[in-house]
Amino acid sequence: TVVVESPCDWVILRLLEAAEVRVIELPLLPGGVIDLQRLESLLESETVRLMLLSSVLSMPRGTHLPLNNQQAVAHLLGRHGTWVLENDCYSELHEGNDAQRLRDWLDPDRLLVFSTFEKFVGAEAPFGYVLSRHWRNELQRHFLLRAFRLSPIRQKAIARLLGGGRLDQHLLILRRML
């Protein structure tokens, strides 16, 4: 069983559905806050193996978890030994550089972090990453297999964008527009 914050990206929901994973949606309260009582109730009544949460920004609302809510959620999940899959796809769109990411409060041994460049560069940059302390070799193998299917020209273009600081300039403009 996987608990996801709701609203949740429909692509993620479809992937979980395709993998025949049981999904329980946990609606966010106004302001993007997680209902701690409801979460604790779910963790006690269900066999929750994984919780999918946003790192900084929760889309499509554009809200972020207040610091005290982040810490309380992390404490609850740690107490129950629940793995967390942190969606870091929209963090770069947050205005401030001082935003605390949820992973700052989580047990790194029960954490996976994923993100993509596609959300802020565009569909022509279908590149992403997954971070994990435990599955590094397996994840690296999967990413290498996928890399051979992607155009080397695209890979070089993204590398130049990242290496030349142009991505940071692009993000500044994008944040102002949002």
Q: Model regions: which residues?
A:
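Conserved core segment of the aminotransferase class I/II
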Residues: 107, 112-175
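Conserved PLP-anchoring active-site segment centered on the Schiff-base-forming lysine
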Residues: 1-10
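Active-site phosphate-binding strand-loop segment of PLP-dependent enzymes
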Residues: 32-95
